[in-house]
Amino acid sequence: MFFPNPEERPYKLPALCEEVNISIHEIELDCVYCERQLYRCEVYDFIFRDLCVVYRKGKPLGVCQPCLLFYSKVRQYRRYNQSVYGRTLENLTNKQLCNILIRCGKCQKPLCPLEKQRHVDENKRFHQIADQWTGRCTQCWRPSATVV
């Protein structure tokens, strides 16, 4: 697979599979960071998290789980802007939470409306990192420690 023309490159994995006529279950991608071939479960996670395919020298690349977690943390430390509560975020953007793209700060999955509502209900903040809003998905959510 080689795409020299940027205008012809599919940036979502299902579109790439369709373009090259390969099943999602058969496509092979390398990691953009460590260059290791993605495991099948990482390919499925890539689709589930609605991540974009990147290209280096015309070759499509994804991201493996360890690199995704590592570089998400690096991005959090280097590109942090601010933290706000749900109501404040709605006021800042003039949009309802359900209409704002908020990704999990750890795994990068887009948050569903219930996950966004959980932040509001539990009085947790959303974080602006590299001008994108993040929170925590259900899978990555860690409840705060309670003293018994």
Swiss-Prot record:
Keywords: Activator, DNA-binding, Early protein, Host cytoplasm, Host nucleus, Host-virus interaction, Inhibition of host innate immune response by virus, Inhibition of host IRF3 by virus, Inhibition of host RLR pathway by virus, Metal-binding, Modulation of host cell apoptosis by virus, Oncogene, Transcription, Transcription regulation, Viral immunoevasion, Zinc, Zinc-finger. This is Protein E6. GO terms for biological process: DNA-templated transcription; regulation of DNA-templated transcription; symbiont-mediated perturbation of host apoptosis; symbiont-mediated perturbation of host ubiquitin-like protein modification; symbiont-mediated suppression of host cytoplasmic pattern recognition receptor signaling pathway via inhibition of IRF3 activity; symbiont-mediated suppression of host type I interferon-mediated signaling pathway. Coiled coil: none annotated. Gene3D superfamilies: E6 early regulatory protein. The lineage of its organism: Viruses, Monodnaviria, Shotokuvirae, Cossaviricota, Papovaviricetes. The gene is E6. GO terms for molecular function: DNA binding; PDZ domain binding; zinc ion binding. GO terms for cellular component: host cell cytoplasm; host cell nucleus. A zinc finger (unnamed) spans 31-67, 104-140. Its main location: host cell. Belongs to the high risk human alphapapillomavirus family. The cancer-causing human papillomavirus E6 protein has a unique carboxy terminal PDZ domain containing substrate. Belongs to the papillomaviridae E6 protein family. Plays a major role in the induction and maintenance of cellular transformation. Acts mainly as an oncoprotein by stimulating the destruction of many host cell key regulatory proteins. E6 associates with host UBE3A/E6-AP ubiquitin-protein ligase, and inactivates tumor suppressors TP53 and TP73 by targeting them to the 26S proteasome for degradation. In turn, DNA damage and chromosomal instabilities increase and lead to cell proliferation and cancer development. A motif (PDZ-binding domain) lies at residues 146-148. Forms homodimers. Interacts with ubiquitin-protein ligase UBE3A/E6-AP and thus forms a complex with human TP53. Interacts with human NFX1 and MAGI3. Interacts with human IRF3; this interaction inhibits the establishment of antiviral state. Interacts with human TYK2; this interaction inhibits JAK-STAT activation by interferon alpha. Interacts with host DLG1; this interaction leads to the proteasomal degradation of DLG1. SUPFAM superfamilies: E6 C-terminal domain-like (SSF161229). It comes from Human papillomavirus type 34.
